[in-house]
Curated annotation (Swiss-Prot):
The lineage of its organism: Eukaryota, Metazoa, Chordata, Craniata, Vertebrata. GO terms for biological process: endoplasmic reticulum to Golgi vesicle-mediated transport; positive regulation of intracellular protein transport. One of its GO terms (cellular component) is endoplasmic reticulum-Golgi intermediate compartment membrane. Pfam families: COPIIcoated_ERV, ERGIC_N. This is Endoplasmic reticulum-Golgi intermediate compartment protein 3. The keyword Flavoprotein does not apply. Its main location: endoplasmic reticulum. The keyword Signal does not apply. Keywords: Acetylation, Endoplasmic reticulum, ER-Golgi transport, Glycoprotein, Golgi apparatus, Membrane, Phosphoprotein, Transmembrane, Transmembrane helix, Transport. The gene is Ergic3. The chain crosses the membrane at residues 26-46, 342-362.
């Protein structure tokens, strides 16, 4: 019993008798408010604990030889789809000219609304032309390429075949009205119909994981003496408006929290024949999710430069939108991790202890202030 008596001397929380405890309305109010605040702070701390934190690390990138996927969604409000070509090339010498297999073009009217097939038929009906039916021709025919025949292309049964044969020869496609295939397909008329339209280009490119560029430019592209050129003879340089809106551009898949700096970028060309260049630095990124899933993608930074691509008015060059990218030799690894449970417990204890302490101080202040005021009131009554 003597030992228990000595132990009681270390009690930091001495108790008072129930008869000496005073309960007040002010104390009840402070208790309820502090309890609600404590609950809100606890829920906030719990929500923070349930989220994951991301730890970044930096490594040398050794993953060469892979393919790089470029996701594209760009609108050109004043450049018809029939005039626009998309090309990609890299420092290894690989070229993709007038890419079509994974990229799609959608015609837009002057208000930016997609042109439906019903609208196309309506436009054709307005000028009362006979729609060309390719099934009406002999499937075994072999038509002329107008001197552009090669070992790969011996027959040109459509206007596009003739254009491709000309492109491979490095010839300019000057006057389609002199070519029977283009005349019967109404090539010139289609070009005229789309003159005031815009174009949306969307899809993806797969390129080698080396430095390179891809661009959107008017005219049919081809190689001539190992030089990449575009046939602009059917355009007036004063009519090329490269105003564009980059809805989305990314290199690889998106991961939580990624920021693509070119998304929703709207650029208005101040004059005709503008050349816009985007210099992009691609940083390979590995994102490891907390469940073990590994996502290999890329981040990038960008700088824009623009100039007039008209030899008479400015520097030499080609009107269009060019994205020139190079890859960083470093790789960023982002790892998701659960937050520390001990940190959560520490936070909860701090919330509870802090609220109890502050609530006790406020309650004591209210109680003693009320007693002091009541004493003065009672003293005034007696006098």
């Amino acid at each position: 019993m003597e030992a228990l008596g000595k132990l009681k001397q270390f009690d930091a929380y001495p108790k008072t008798l129930e008869d000496f405890r005073v309960k007040t309305c002010g104390g009840a109010t402070v208790t309820i408010v502090s309890g609600l605040l404590m609950l809100l702070l606890f829920l906030s701390e719990l929500q923070y604990y349930l989220t994951t934190e991301v730890h970044p690390e930096l490594y040398v990138d050794k993953s060469r030889g892979d393919k790089l996927k470029i996701n594209i969604d760009v609108l050109f409000p004043h450049m018809p789809c029939a005039y626009l070509s998309i090309d990609a090339m890299d420092v290894a010498g690989e070229q993709q000219l007038d890419v079509e297999h994974n990229l799609f073009k959608k015609r837009l009217d002057k208000d930016g609304v997609p042109v439906s097939s019903e609208a196309e038929r309506h436009e054709l009906g307005k000028v009362e032309v006979t729609v060309f039916d390719p099934n009406s021709l002999d499937p075994n025919r072999c038509e002329s390429c107008y001197g552009a025949e090669s070992e790969d292309i011996k027959c040109c049964n459509s206007c596009e075949d003739v254009r491709e044969a000309y492109r491979r020869r490095g010839w300019a496609f000057k006057n389609p009205d002199t070519i029977e295939q283009c005349r019967r397909e109404g090539f010139s008329q289609k070009m005229q119909e789309q003159k005031n339209e815009g174009c949306q280009v969307y899809g993806f490119l797969e390129v080698n994981k080396v430095a390179g560029n891809f661009h959107f430019a008017p005219g049919k592209s081809f190689q001539q003496s190992h030089v990449h050129v575009h046939d602009l003879q059917s355009f007036g340089l004063d009519n090329i408006n490269m105003t564009h809106y980059i809805k989305h551009l990314s290199f690889g898949e998106d991961y939580p929290g990624i920021v693509n700096p070119l998304d929703h970028t709207n650029v208005t060309a101040p004059q005709a024949s503008m050349m816009f260049q985007y210099f992009v630095k691609v940083v390979p990124t590995v994102y490891m999710k907390v469940d073990g899933e590994v996502l290999r993608t890329n981040q990038f930074s960008v700088t824009r430069h623009e100039k007039v691509a008209n030899g008479l008015l400015g520097d030499q060059g080609l009107p269009g939108v060019f994205v020139l990218y190079e890859l960083s030799p470093m790789m960023v690894k982002l790892t998701e991790k659960h937050r520390s449970f001990t940190h959560f417990l520490t936070g909860v204890c701090a919330i509870i202890g802090g609220m109890f302490t502050v609530a006790g101080l406020i309650d004591s202040l209210i109680y003693h202030s009320a007693r002091a005021i009541q004493k003065k009131i009672d003293l005034g009554k007696t006098t």
